[in-house]
C-alpha cells in the first residue's frame, strides 16, 4: 500500500484512487512573469517524482498543470518592459519549458493556460452567482467565503483570525465593494485602456487567480480529483479558495489528497529578494554544467520538508551522484568480461534493496530512505565487481535495478556517455588505442590531457576506467 500525507487531515492515509489503476493529478504551475526560482523548480521536481513513482507502480497518471498567464504581476511586467501581457506570458512560459527540460521533468498530460479557458471561467462565475455563493460589486465579482461551510479547514485557519488579517490588507475601495473582508475575487473589473481584459456579463475584466485552477482542474480532469499538489505557501489562500469555489459549484468533494512540498532555503535563510538570495533556475543552469545534480539535490530531502541550498550542498550532491555513476560504469565495464549465469547470493541482496526502496517510497515518498537503498545497491555492485569472476545475469540485474530505481528520481544517462563532450570522448578513445599499441608515453600524455578537461582515468587488468 502507498501512504500519502494529506494536508487536509494532517495524517498519512492509504492511497485509494477514484478509478482503479488510474490517477487524476493536478499541480499548480507558475505565474509566468519571470524566470522560475529554485523553489518553483523543487515543486516541479517533487511532483514529477511522485508521478514517476506511481507510474513505476503501474498506475496510469493523467497529470495536468497550468501556467497562470493573466495576473497583476504579468500586467506590471508588461508595462515595465513595454510589451503586451501576452508577450510577457509567452516569453516566460517558453523559458519555463527551456529551463525544466534539462531537469528531465516529464511533460504534463495537459499544460493549460488560464487565457485558454476564459469562457469556462465566466460560466463558472455565473453558476456561483446563481447559487448565491458570489455577488457582483462595481464590476468585480466576489465569493462569499463565510457562506461556504468549512472555509479555511485546509490551512487550519481560524475564521476570526482570517477576517482580522484580511481587514488589515484592504484599501478603502475594497472595503466598500466587499460584503466581508475575507471574501475573495473570482472576477476582476478592468477599466483601463490597453490592459488585457475580456467581455463578461459584469463588464470588461479578467479572472481572479484562484478560479483559474478550479476551472482547469474540472475541465481537464473531473469534479473530484485524486491528488492536488503545490508548494506549502499555496495552501492558504490559493488552495483554500479553490476548495470553496469548486465545492460550492458542484456540491462534490474537490480533492481527495492534498499534497504540499516544503520551502527551499538558501544558506539556511528563507529565500527572498529583500535578502538578496533569490536564485532563479535560469541563472543556476547558466553557471552549473550538470543539471542532473540540481535535480538530485532537490530529491535528497523528503518533499514535505524544507531543504537548504548552498554551494556545499550542491557539491555534496555532485559527489554522491558521481559515486552512483562511477559504480554503474564499472558494472558496465565488468559486464563485457562476465561469464554466463548468475550468483544467487548477490541476486538475493539486490531484491532486498529493491524491496527497501519500494517500502520507502510507499511511505509518503520518502526519498532519503529510497536513496539509501540505492546506495546499498551501489555498495553491492562495487563489492561484486572486485571479484575475479562475475556472472552476466547478476551484473545485468544490478544495472537494470539501479537504472529503474533512479528513473523514478528522473536520473538517467548513468553510463556517462551523455555527460561527455566530443573532445573528452575522442581523448578516451585515443588513449585506449595507445594502450593497445603499448605506446605508454602517448598514453600518459593523453591521461594528462584528460585530467585538464576533468576526466580521471585508471588502468585495471580489465582495461581503462574513467570518472570525473
Curated annotation (Swiss-Prot):
InterPro entries per the record?
A: Cys-tRNA-ligase (IPR015803), Cys-tRNA-synt_Ia_DALR (IPR015273), Cys-tRNA/MSH_ligase (IPR024909), CysS_C (IPR056411), Rossmann-like_a/b/a_fold (IPR014729), tRNA-synt_1_cat_dom (IPR032678), tRNAsynth_Ia_anticodon-bd (IPR009080)
Q: Which keywords does this chain's UniProt record carry?
A: Aminoacyl-tRNA synthetase, ATP-binding, Cytoplasm, Ligase, Metal-binding, Nucleotide-binding, Protein biosynthesis, Zinc
Q: Which domain of life is it from?
A: Bacteria
> Where is it chiefly localized?
cytoplasm
Q: Which Gene3D superfamilies match?
A: Cysteine-tRNA ligase, C-terminal anti-codon recognition domain (1.20.120.1910), HUPs (3.40.50.620)
Motif segment ('KMSKS' region): 270-274
What are the protein's GO molecular function terms?
ATP binding; cysteine-tRNA ligase activity; zinc ion binding
The UniProt record gives the binding positions of Zn(2+) as: 28, 213, 238, 242
Calcium: is it a keyword of this entry? no
EC identifiers of the protein:
6.1.1.16
Q: How is the cofactor bound?
A: Binds 1 zinc ion per subunit.
Q: How does it assemble?
A: Monomer.
Question: What is the similarity comment for this entry?
Answer: Belongs to the class-I aminoacyl-tRNA synthetase family.
In Swiss-Prot or TrEMBL terms, this protein is called Cysteine--tRNA ligase
- Species assigned in the record: Leuconostoc mesenteroides subsp. mesenteroides (strain ATCC 8293 / DSM 20343 / BCRC 11652 / CCM 1803 / JCM 6124 / NCDO 523 / NBRC 100496 / NCIMB 8023 / NCTC 12954 / NRRL B-1118 / 37Y)
Where is the organism placed in the taxonomic lineage, from the top?
Bacteria, Bacillati, Bacillota, Bacilli, Lactobacillales
Amino acid at each position: 500500500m502507498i501512504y500519502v500525507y494529506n494536508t487536509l487531515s494532517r495524517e498519512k492515509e492509504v492511497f485509494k484512487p477514484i478509478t482503479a489503476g488510474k490517477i487524476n493529478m493536478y499541480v499548480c504551475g507558475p505565474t509566468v512573469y519571470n524566470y522560475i526560482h529554485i523553489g518553483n523548480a523543487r515543486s516541479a521536481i517533487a511532483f514529477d517524482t511522485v508521478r514517476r513513482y506511481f507510474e513505476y507502480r503501474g498506475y496510469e497518471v493523467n497529470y495536468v498543470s497550468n501556467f497562470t498567464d493573466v495576473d497583476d504581476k504579468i500586467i506590471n511586467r508588461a508595462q515595465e518592459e513595454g510589451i503586451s501581457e501576452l508577450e510577457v506570458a509567452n516569453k516566460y512560459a517558453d523559458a519555463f519549458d527551456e529551463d525544466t527540460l534539462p531537469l528531465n521533468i516529464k511533460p504534463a498530460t495537459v499544460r493549460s493556460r488560464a487565457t485558454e479557458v476564459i469562457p469556462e471561467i465566466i460560466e463558472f462565475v455565473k453558476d456561483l452567482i446563481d447559487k448565491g455563493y458570489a455577488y457582483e460589486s462595481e464590476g468585480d465579482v466576489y465569493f462569499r467565503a463565510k457562506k461556504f461551510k468549512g472555509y479555511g479547514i485546509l490551512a487550519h485557519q481560524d475564521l476570526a483570525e482570517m477576517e482580522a488579517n484580511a481587514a488589515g490588507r484592504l484599501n478603502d475601495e475594497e472595503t466598500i465593494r466587499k460584503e466581508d473582508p475575507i471574501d475573495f475575487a473570482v472576477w476582476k473589473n478592468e477599466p483601463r485602456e490597453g490592459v488585457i481584459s475580456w467581455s463578461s456579463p459584469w463588464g470588461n475584466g479578467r479572472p481572479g487567480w484562484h478560479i483559474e485552477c478550479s476551472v482547469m482542474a474540472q475541465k481537464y480532469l473531473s469534479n473530484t480529483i485524486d491528488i492536488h499538489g503545490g508548494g506549502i505557501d499555496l495552501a492558504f489562500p490559493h488552495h483554500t479558495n479553490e476548495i470553496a469555489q469548486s465545492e460550492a459549484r458542484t456540491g462534490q468533494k474537490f480533492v481527495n489528497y492534498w499534497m504540499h512540498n516544503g520551502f527551499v532555503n538558501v544558506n539556511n535563510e528563507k529565500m527572498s529578494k529583500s535578502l538578496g538570495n533569490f536564485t532563479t533556475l535560469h541563472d543556476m543552469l547558466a553557471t552549473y554544467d550538470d543539471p542532473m545534480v540540481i535535480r538530485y539535490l532537490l530529491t535528497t530531502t523528503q518533499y514535505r520538508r524544507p531543504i537548504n541550498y548552498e554551494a556545499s550542498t550542491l557539491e555534496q550532491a555532485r559527489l554522491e551522484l558521481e559515486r552512483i555513476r562511477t559504480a554503474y560504469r564499472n558494472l558496465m565495464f565488468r559486464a563485457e568480461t562476465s561469464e554466463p549465469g548468475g550468483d544467487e547470493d548477490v541476486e538475493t541482496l539486490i531484491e532486498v534493496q529493491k524491496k527497501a526502496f519500494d517500502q520507502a517510497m510507499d511511505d509518503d515518498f520518502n526519498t532519503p530512505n529510497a536513496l539509501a537503498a540505492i546506495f546499498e545497491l551501489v555498495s553491492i555492485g562495487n563489492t561484486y565487481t572486485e571479484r575475479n569472476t562475475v556472472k552476466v545475469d547478476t551484473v545485468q540485474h544490478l544495472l537494470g535495478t539501479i537504472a529503474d530505481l533512479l528513473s523514478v528520481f528522473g536520473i538517467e544517462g548513468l553510463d556517462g556517455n551523455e555527460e561527455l563532450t566530443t573532445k573528452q570522448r575522442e581523448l578516451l578513445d585515443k588513449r585506449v588505442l595507445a594502450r593497445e599499441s603499448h605506446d605508454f608515453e602517448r598514453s600518459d600524455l593523453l591521461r594528462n590531457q584528460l585530467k585538464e578537461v576533468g576526466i580521471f582515468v585508471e588502468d585495471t587488468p580489465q582495461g581503462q576506467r574513467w570518472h570525473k
